[in-house]
Curated annotation (Swiss-Prot):
Keywords: Cell membrane, Chemotaxis, Disulfide bond, G-protein coupled receptor, Glycoprotein, Membrane, Receptor, Transducer, Transmembrane, Transmembrane helix. This is C-X-C chemokine receptor type 1. Residues 68-76, 134-154, 226-243, 311-351 are cytoplasmic. Belongs to the G-protein coupled receptor 1 family. The keyword Transmembrane applies. Disulfide bonds join C111-C188.
Amino acid sequence: MSNATDPQMGDDDYDLNFTGMPPTDEDYSPCRLETQSLNKYVVIVTYALVFLLSLLGNSLVMLVILYRRVGRSVTDVYLLNLAMADLLFALTLPIWAASKVNGWIFGTFLCKVVSLLKEVNFYSGILLLACISVDRYLAIVHATRTLIQKRHSVKFVCLSCWGLSVILSLPFFLFRQAYHPNNSTPVCYEVLGNDTAKWRMVLRILPHTFGFTLPLLIMLFCYGFTLHTLFKAHIGQKHRAMRVIFAVVLIFLLCWLPYNLVLLADTLMRTHLIKESCERRNDIGRALDATEILGFLHSCLNPIIYAFIGQNFRHGFLKILATHGLVSKEFLARHHVTSYTSSSVNVSSNL
């Protein structure tokens, strides 16, 4: 997702570019942003916290899944790739945080590489969430093992998600460069010549469609039918499974839908499809800062939603601790018995 707040300005008197669109002589207007400094430091602290939490949580998820070589499920393969996507996404946050202080000082090459890495892992994460919803839909609604549920096919699906993510992200790698507007600090920005605003609209609409809207519709469709099936079926602990599924969709919506809506409003304003004013630019700039924080938070919430709630993850983590003598094997055995008697049909245990 094109991060409209990546190119942050310094402590200049005027806000030239806080929504990521360097001003031109035609559309420049001296809009002041009263909360610039406050927003800057709030975002830096948030990036640091998300980076640390995501690094810890997703590393643990990868450790547990890779440690469990026998009995690794289809969902585990998706979760492993999702953890990799979130972890790689989080690794770009320190660089973006540093750019909040003095602008983009890292040059064009790093601008391209870090932007590509950030975009690829954002989109791969969302596409993998959609794949998990399809996997749960097939397992619960159709209760059958289709080709997509075979391990080699799942690996192909994951590779396809990464490949599509690279394709969606290529424009940012090709067109982004270090850019130094007049009377302002340098930014990492897509430079497309005289038609920059028009092409930026295209660069936003295509990823919005294929990297957000379509995966979201797939998730809503699959989880909708999955919940309907669980309501009709007489399955033990089905309410627990429903809580996990609700968390999947609701957390995703809470984290990314607000940012995408505000980003759409910013694009419409910058292309003059809605009226532009200093007040509106300030409002959208503050909204982008706030909603971007929610979106970035999603990368460290995934381990909680998809792993820490699940019985299998907790048992796998305790098994690693027991192997290294950090917990007793008796405690591990008691936990395994409790997990087995309280879990339902793979619906919630995998999640």
